[in-house]
Structure formats: structure tokens, C-alpha cells
């Protein structure tokens, strides 16, 4: 019996010829990631183990991105724990303010993840790297501590759901719309502890930015990981970034899947997920008059250059509605610089937006855009749980950058065609 991409990567890293769903394995990790929320606890647990050095200072990555720049004394102390540990251990990849970016935008850009890798991170959206044909999944801080010490971790081999997306996408439809539609169809637990393998004509034609967005939100369907077959676009993306060898895995024709789901992507409209779950996805055209107070364009889901280009295309020559706050957050310093060079930042500022240094900030209700009681936000982020962006009686709607930009102009949730004719 054949194996899926996910099964092949896990088998290779466990030193086994084959694995099957449900099997418990111990596998070597290529990269272990922590941030300013999760790494302090991992570092504390690491020190309790009595281990003096991490397994490999080039393969432990620390990124202070959630509360950076530090918003208060506590967050400053959290970041200092990372900074001190990185110095003590001689870590190659500690990303300080000025070099920092939102971790899941930053690591692929920096060439730290490649096809066939096994990556664990103490952040649930570590699954983003599946866009590169890697097995990447989120873990807890104690598991991160174990991986930092040993370079290995235990896994239960997941079953895989195969998604095939057929047809050509409509204008303004991107990866965010595909994944919101998918989560709306299968539910937030529809892929619980399963690999989500994305294939089909629409995926072949989807940009790498769109693929990162889809893989990023696999966890929002309960997925263990999201993964894409490596193709020419993948190889082109890593060319000049990844400075080491890698291995490409493809699913066998006779691989076993939990289920196979076919989706006509040509019929998908720009999507909006209503409070308070990502599964509450609707076509933007089905949504009535919903006024908003704030729009956030950015995050590890949609803070890449293509996302900013889409938003700027709609905002060019427009003004943000006087009753709306628009916050734009590029995912990394490199993305910020590229957006500046292309004139995108000027477009945002001229429209009336606030542009921030890279940070997770408002996505988790941390800083840089917290909602007050009764306020509504539309965001290109990945979660809209109760209180996610601030007050428990606020609301968050999820959408892609096109809908977000149009909504910022209209002062209500709006389709891109309402602004760009």
C-alpha cells in the first residue's frame, strides 16, 4: 500500500520504511520554533531537564513577534528571556526587533524551511510551512523543550484528507477564500488530527502566498497539518532562499485517504467568516448591511506582499471611511521594504491607514488595535473566537485582503466590486 506525502515525511524522519495512520513514532525534527509567548515556558522546562545545550543551535529558532515591540513590562521581560537564552546557547536564528517578522511569514522568507522538512513550533499556525511541501505542526511548550534538548519528538501518524480544487478562480478570490469556504464546508473539527492535502487545477494556479494562507488555516479545521505537493512554483520560491539540500515527496497513486473531497473552485465567491468561528463562512454577497469599526490587513495569514498589493489596488485613490480605523501590518521587514519601494505604503497612508512594524499585535488581542465593547472588526487574520481581538462583547469577521480593503472604504462589509468597477 502506498503512502501520502505526510506519511512519507514522518517515516523518513523516524528512520522507517513505512508508517500508517494511528502509529506512534519518534522522529527527528529539522527545526524547532518558539515565540515570545510560548518559548519562555519551553526555556524554563528545558532548564529543568538539566541539559546544558540545545541539540543544534542552528535548528532552534526564536522569534519575539506576538508583543513586539514590547507593549509593557511583562512582554518586555518575556522577550528578554528569549534574548538571553539565544545568547547563552549561541543560537544562529534569533530575530531581534528590526530583523524580526511575524514568524510564519519570516521563516520561509529566510530560507529556514524546505520541502520534506519536519518542523515543530510552539504556535498552532506552524502548519503554514506545509505550503512548501514540509510536515509542519504546532506543539505545546513542554514538547518544544523536549525537542530543543533532544532533536526528536513523538508523533501519532495522522490520516489524510485529500482536497481537489477544480476550475479557475473568479476575480478577487484567493487562498483565503478557498480555505474559508473549505472550513465552512467541513467545520472547525472536520479534519481533526488529520493531514489536509491540497491539490487540483486551482491549487496548481494558486500563488505561493495563497498556499501559505491555506496551509496556515488548516488548524482552523482541526487539522494536524496542511500540505501541498511540491511543484515548479515551490521550487522557484525556495530558489535563492534555501541554501541546503532538500527532498521532495509526493503521494503514491495508491495512497490511502480518510476521504477525498472535490470542490468546484470556479463557483467560490469572496468569503467572509462571521463571528465566532471560522466555519461561519458566507459569500460576501450574502451578507447584509454590517457596519464595522476597524479593519486589519496583515498577520501570518495575509501579511505577505501579494496581500498588500491586492489591498493597495483597491485603496488606490480611495479614502478610508471616516468611521473606520484601518491598520496595515506587513508580515516582515523585507515585505515592508518591498511594499515601500512599490509605493504600496504611500497608497495606504494616503487612503488614511495606519501602517505598523511587523507584529502579531491585534490578531490575538495583544496590542496595536484592541477592540472595545460592542465594536466590530473585519480582519485578514485566522481566528474570530469570542474576545479574540479584545473585549468579549466585540466581534471579528474574517476575510481576504480584497474584501478587507473594500470594507475599509465603505464602512461596512463590502465586495471588492463595490469599490473597483
Curated annotation (Swiss-Prot):
Gene3D superfamilies: Aconitase, domain 3. [4Fe-4S] cluster binds at residues 300, 360, 363. Signal peptide: none annotated. Binds 1 [4Fe-4S] cluster per subunit. Its cofactor is [4Fe-4S] cluster. It is an enzyme of class 4 (lyase). InterPro entries: Acnase/IPM_dHydase_lsu_aba_1/3 (IPR015931), Acoase/IPM_deHydtase_lsu_aba (IPR001030), Aconitase_4Fe-4S_BS (IPR018136), Aconitase_4Fe-4S_dom (IPR036008), HAcnase/IPMdehydase_lsu_prok (IPR011826), Homoacnase/IPMdehydase_lsu (IPR006251), IPM_dehydratase_rel_enz (IPR050067), IPMI_cat (IPR033941). Keywords: 4Fe-4S, Amino-acid biosynthesis, Branched-chain amino acid biosynthesis, Iron, Iron-sulfur, Leucine biosynthesis, Lyase, Metal-binding. GO terms for molecular function: 3-isopropylmalate dehydratase activity; 4 iron, 4 sulfur cluster binding; metal ion binding. It comes from the Bacteria. It catalyses: (2R,3S)-3-isopropylmalate = (2S)-2-isopropylmalate. Pathway: Amino-acid biosynthesis; L-leucine biosynthesis; L-leucine from 3-methyl-2-oxobutanoate: step 2/4. Pfam families: Aconitase. Heterodimer of LeuC and LeuD. Catalyzes the isomerization between 2-isopropylmalate and 3-isopropylmalate, via the formation of 2-isopropylmaleate. Belongs to the aconitase/IPM isomerase family. LeuC type 2 subfamily. This is 3-isopropylmalate dehydratase large subunit. It comes from Moorella thermoacetica (strain ATCC 39073 / JCM 9320).
Amino acid at each position: 500500500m502506498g503512502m501520502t506525502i505526510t506519511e512519507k515525511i514522518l517515516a523518513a524522519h523516524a528512520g522507517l520504511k513505512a508508517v500508517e495512520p494511528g502509529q506512534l513514532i519518534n522522529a527527528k525534527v529539522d527545526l524547532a520554533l518558539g515565540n515570545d509567548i510560548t518559548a519562555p515556558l519551553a526555556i524554563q522546562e528545558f532548564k529543568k531537564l538539566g541539559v546544558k545545550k540545545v541539540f543544534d543551535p542552528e535548528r532552534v529558532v526564536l522569534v519575539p513577534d506576538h508583543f513586539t515591540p514590547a507593549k509593557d513590562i511583562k512582554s518586555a521581560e518575556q522577550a528578554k528571556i528569549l534574548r538571553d537564552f539565544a545568547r547563552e546557547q549561541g543560537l544562529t536564528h534569533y530575530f531581534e526587533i528590526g530583523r524580526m517578522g511575524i514568524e510564519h511569514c519570516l521563516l520561509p522568507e529566510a530560507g529556514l524551511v524546505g520541502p520534506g522538512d519536519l518542523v515543530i513550533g510552539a504556535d498552532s499556525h506552524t502548519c503554514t510551512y506545509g505550503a512548501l511541501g514540509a510536515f509542519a505542526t504546532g506543539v505545546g511548550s513542554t514538547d518544544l523543550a523536549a525537542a530543543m534538548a533532544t532533536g526528536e519528538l513523538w508523533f501519532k501518524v495522522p490520516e489524510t484528507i485529500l482536497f481537489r480544487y477544480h476550475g479557475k478562480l473568479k476575480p478577487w478570490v484567493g487562498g483565503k477564500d478557498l480555505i474559508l469556504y473549505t472550513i465552512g464546508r467541513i467545520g472547525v473539527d472536520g479534519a481533526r488530527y488529520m493531514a489536509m492535502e491540497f491539490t487540483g487545477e486551482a491549487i496548481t494556479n494558486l500563488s505561493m502566498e495563497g498556499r501559505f494562507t491555506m496551509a496556515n488555516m488548516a488548524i482552523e479545521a482541526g487539522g494536524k497539518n496542511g500540505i501541498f505537493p511540491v511543484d515548479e512554483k515551490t521550487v522557484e520560491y525556495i530558489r535563492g532562499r534555501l541554501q541546503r539540500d532538500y527532498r521532495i515527496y509526493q503521494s503514491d497513486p495508491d495512497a490511502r485517504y480518510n476521504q477525498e473531497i472535490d470542490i468546484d473552485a470556479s463557483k467560490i465567491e469572496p468569503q467572509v467568516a462571521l463571528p465566532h468561528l471560522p466555519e461561519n463562512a458566507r459569500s460576501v454577497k450574502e451578507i447584509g448591511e454590517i457596519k464595522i469599526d476597524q479593519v486589519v490587513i496583515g498577520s501570518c495569514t495575509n501579511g505577505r506582499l501579494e496581500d498588500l498589493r491586492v489591498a493597495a489596488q483597491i485603496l488606490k485613490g480611495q479614502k478610508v471611511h471616516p468611521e473606520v480605523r484601518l491598520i496595515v501590518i506587513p508580515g516582515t521587514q523585507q515585505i515592508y521594504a518591498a511594499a515601500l519601494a512599490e509605493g504600496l505604503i504611500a497608497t495606504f497612508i494616503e487612503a488614511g491607514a495606519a501602517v505598523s512594524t511587523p507584529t502579531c499585535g491585534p490578531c490575538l488581542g495583544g496590542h496595536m488595535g484592541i477592540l472595545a465593547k460592542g465594536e466590530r472588526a473585519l480582519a485578514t487574520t485566522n481566528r474570530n473566537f469570542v474576545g479574540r481581538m479584545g473585549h468579549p462583547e466585540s466581534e471579528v469577521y474574517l476575510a481576504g485582503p480584497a474584501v478587507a480593503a473594500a470594507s475599509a472604504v465603505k464602512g461596512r462589509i463590502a465586495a471588492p466590486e463595490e469599490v473597483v468597477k
